[in-house]
Amino acid sequence: MFENNLWTMEPVGRPENTIQGDKYRFTLLTPCLIRMEYREDGKFEDRPTQVVWNRKFDPVDFRVEKKDEGFELFTDRMHVTYAGGPFTKNSLNLNAVGGQNAYGAVWYYGEKGDNLGGTARTLDEVDGECPLQEGIMSRSGCSQID
């Protein structure tokens, strides 16, 4: 836990919401928000970032089924399939339940998807369109922050 005079940061997720192997760690933050990490040395980042200061959210109901080197993870909002090894489009995908269509939307590791864009810091001196960085919403139901 990190503290200062203004706020408390809890950048480490709940242990009961974490699925971890020697080189991977998946932390469920909500039923539809997951942090996925892979490191060859098995040393994972536990400090707060500029974007995320708190990862200690409420407990999440989920189910895990081990599959060879990997697993399948289920919540009421997503289905994650991880085959093991480094993250690639062939080893990691996520199906968002109720995403783009009645069958959901599948995201494969490395895909950018159909991101809807983020927010502008200011609209001062903007006349018309302004460029936006990627945001946290997409038309497919899956987006990523790296």
What are these regions (language model features)?
Residues 2-13:
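Short, Gly/Pro- and small/polar-rich lid/capping loops
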Residues 2-4, 29-68:
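A low-complexity, Ser/Thr/Gly/Pro-enriched, surface-exposed linker/loop concept
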Residues 5, 64-146:
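Catalytic and substrate-binding clefts that recognize carbohydrates or anionic sugar/phosphate headgroups
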Residues 12, 19-20, 57, 64-66, ...:
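Short solvent-exposed loop/turn micro-motifs enriched in small/polar/acidic residues
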Residues 17-21, 36, 69-76:
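Generic recognition of long tandem-repeat/solenoid scaffolds
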Residues 18, 23, 33, 141-142:
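A residue-level signal for beta-strand positions that form part of recognition/binding surfaces
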Residues 19, 44, 135-136:
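Long, contiguous hydrophobic alpha-helical segments, chiefly transmembrane helices and signal peptides
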